């Protein structure tokens, strides 16, 4: 996010979609909420491999780090596809949409089951649907 903010102009907004993995370091979650809302024009909190945890619980832990002055700079959408869709819909032509977290992974792990989910595929699919 720092690298993006160093090169973007003041007219380009940064819209960040991110989440935290389940069954992992709980202490990092509030810090990620704080940083994402500080450094983004809009942060959209979503799921990222909730594993055996309730996605809403993970999101609440992330939200706990959002500072009061940044409450208007985020929203939470548990469905990752819908979160990406919201980011694309909100974006204007010069904006930057950062979908963070999954990288090369092509699945969402939920309750021990890996469900196919690829951020890149989803972005391309949604962009095609929304530009018709």
Explain the meaning of each model-derived region.
Residues 1-132:
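ATP-dependent carboxylate-amine ligase
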């Amino acid at each position: 996010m720092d690298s993006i903010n160093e090169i973007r102009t003041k007219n380009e907004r940064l819209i960040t979609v991110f989440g935290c993995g389940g069954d992992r370091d709980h202490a990092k979650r509030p810090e990620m909420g704080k940083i994402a809302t500080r450094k983004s024009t809009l942060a959209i909190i979503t799921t990222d491999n909730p594993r055996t945890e309730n996605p809403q619980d993970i999101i609440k832990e992330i939200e706990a780090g959002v500072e009061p002055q940044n409450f208007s700079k985020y929203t939470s959408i548990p469905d990752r596809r819908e979160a990406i869709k919201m980011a694309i819909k909100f974006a204007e032509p010069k904006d930057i949409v950062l979908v963070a977290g999954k990288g090369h992974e092509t699945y969402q792990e939920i309750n021990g089951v890996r469900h196919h989910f690829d951020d890149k595929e989803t972005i391309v699919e949604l962009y095609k649907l929304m530009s018709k």
